[in-house]
Design a protein with these regions (language model features):
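Conserved ABC ATPase "signature" region
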Residues: 112-130, 182
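A short, proline-enriched helix->beta-strand linker immediately N-terminal to the Walker B motif
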Residues: 153-157
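ABC-type ATPase nucleotide-binding domains, specifically the catalytic core motifs of the NBD
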Residues: 16-18, 93, 97-114, 124
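The feature captures the beta-strand-to-loop junction immediately N-terminal to the Walker
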Residues: 41-43
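Helix-to-loop junction immediately C-terminal to a conserved catalytic motif
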Residues: 56
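Conserved ABC ATPase signature
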Residues: 134-138, 142
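Conserved ABC transporter NBD signature motif
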Residues: 64-76
Length: 259
């Protein structure tokens, strides 16, 4: 059994609003093993992105504990990379400079070694010929690849991905899912991947955490049975559709958490 890298121990997260406190997450307990790819599925407002923010140290839990490497998360960490829904790139910098920007921001300079590593990562994400291009010359999918390369530059142990392909069209989204699979196989990371797309979760993940509507509770944790490497043929397997239908039933089922 893989050693737990990320642990949620009976976590509750509430937010104060003008109409009173709202509980986003309640009684969430699960862990993520080293180099495990975990996808989180759930309806809008169930706290999926809140889980990610807790691991990132951007917020602190109202109750319970979130741990990384057996230590409570009390703030942002250098060993965690984040890819958001939108790539948030800097249009006045070229592609390579966007990838190396975290180094410039943190240390005030970018070394030759870091620039070389940025070029290597651009090759990994399929953009080796675009390093000198401006951001506005790239498609949405290409911009998200730049964001992934940027997140990988610091060589994080843990990669948090908050619906990174949600703004893309269906074909580009599928292409990016396979691209992410290839990158993950080349450079394994512990991944927490937030998504609304059931096929995307089944294609990418080792396990899927299915959340209830708000307050978000863990309804079920599903082991994904398909061997790696996965391919287009995986999408056509009968078991794939069976699991997709099962997850839909869980997402729309009444009731609370499964014991």
């Amino acid at each position: 059994m893989r050693k737990a890298v990320v642990q949620f121990d009976d976590v509750r997260q509430a937010f104060d609003t003008k109409n009173g406190a709202i509980t986003a997450i309640d009684s969430a307990s699960f862990d993520i093993g080293r180099h495990e790819f975990i996808a989180v599925l759930g309806p809008s407002g169930c706290g999926k992105s809140t889980l990610l923010r807790l691991v990132a140290g951007l917020i602190q839990p109202t109750a319970g504990a979130v741990k990384v490497y057996d230590r409570r998360v009390d703030g942002p960490r250098d060993d965690i990379g984040i890819v958001f829904q939108k790539p948030t790139l800097l249009p006045w910098l070229d592609v390579t400079a966007n990838v190396t920007f975290p180094m410039l921001h943190k240390f005030g300079r970018v070394t030759v070694t870091e620039t070389d590593e940025a070029r290597r990562l651009l090759k990994v994400v399929g953009l080796s010929d675009f390093g000198s291009k401006s951001i506005d010359q790239l498609s949405g999918g290409m911009q998200q690849r730049v964001a992934i390369a940027r997140a990988l530059l610091l060589n994080p142990d843990i990669l948090l991905m908050d619906e990174p392909f949600s703004a893309l069209d269906a074909l580009t989204r599928e292409e990016m899912s396979f691209e992410l699979l290839r990158i993950w196989c080349t450079s394994p990371k512990t991944v927490l991947f937030i998504t609304h797309a059931i096929p995307e979760a089944l294609l990418l993940a080792d396990r899927i955490i299915v959340m209830t509507p708000r307050p978000g509770r863990v309804r079920e944790i599903i082991d994904v049975p398909f061997p790696r490497p996965r391919s287009l043929a995986t999408l056509s397997e009968p078991r794939f559709n069976e699991l997709a239908n099962h997850i839909r039933e869980q997402l729309f089922a009444p009731g609370l958490v499964h014991a």
